[in-house]
Amino acid sequence: MNIPESVSYKRPESHFGWRAELSLKYGIKREKTRLLERHQLGPLTVQKTFYPEGAACHTYLLHPPGGVVGGDQLSFNIDVGTQAHALLTTPGATKFYRSNGEQAWQSQELTVAKDGLLEWLPMENIFFPGANCKLLTQVNLATNARFIGWEMQCFGRPMLAETFDNGQVLGQTFIHRDHRVLLAETLRVKSQSHIDQAAALRNFAMSGSLYITPIEPELIDKINQVIDEQQLRFGSEILLGSSEIGSASTSSAMSLTSTAEDSLIVVRALGQQTEPMMASFVQIWRCVRLHWFGELPEVPRIWST
């Protein structure tokens, strides 16, 4: 498997649009995870932190209400300290509108220190016809750090019979542990032809990926059981599958690393609507949290509004 060692999608040079940055640093203080530092530039911001689960810190990221257009640049830098536990989500979808000729850019650098846990659970990205976007997600994990996160992409607006008939979306996702590459993958969608291809989106308008690390065989079995249940629940509305990378994998061809903490499972989803995909990912997330902590998590209330 050919894994690139460096990021190839660089921030574009643009004199149009606005630039927004949000940096958040979490750490333990008085026996709770707290938002210790916050730096922001432009319209990206957060609501107050919430503690529905006791020591874990829930945070809602607020995107610009007007959406993202060509030339706009969004940058998130999230740092979770040793033994800290942070959950981040968004109250709604991020909308990327038709380009004016410039590219829109969104980057997310997520760093988790030793024994920390980050749950990165945003709502979907919606790409309107004519959008021109570059997306980059980098996850940097230290020893014994835990991560569960998802990305959901919607091309066009299928509920309105609006297809992604022109435009392009280029994305990269990297996951590292102790500077070792666990995962590197690329997304390229250029107009409806890519969506129609069997090797791409198989005529589905939505694509989703859910990443979980570390894993072990027992957790893999539980996740696959939930996948089967959700596939039965939603039928043809969604197509779900999973693959394992690392020492927990049953396929030696997929094994890239040699230690248990380097193992990773990726759940893939294709669909036409957000609700079945989101519901399936939430059930898998609940399964993982129950396995890790022995109790079910508190679902962010914003998901129910």
From Swiss-Prot:
A GO molecular-function descriptor: nickel cation binding
Entry protein name: Urease accessory protein UreD
Predominant subcellular localization, coarse grouping: cytoplasm
Domain of life: Bacteria
InterPro entries reported for this sequence: UreD (IPR002669)
The keyword Cytoplasm is assigned to this record: yes
Quaternary structure, from the entry: UreD, UreF and UreG form a complex that acts as a GTP-hydrolysis-dependent molecular chaperone, activating the urease apoprotein by helping to assemble the nickel containing metallocenter of UreC. The UreE protein probably delivers the nickel.
Keyword entries, A-Z: Chaperone, Cytoplasm, Nickel insertion
Function of the protein: Required for maturation of urease via the functional incorporation of the urease nickel metallocenter.
Similarity field: Belongs to the UreD family.
Annotated localization: Cytoplasm
Keyword Protein biosynthesis: no
Cellular component GO terms held in the UniProt record: cytoplasm
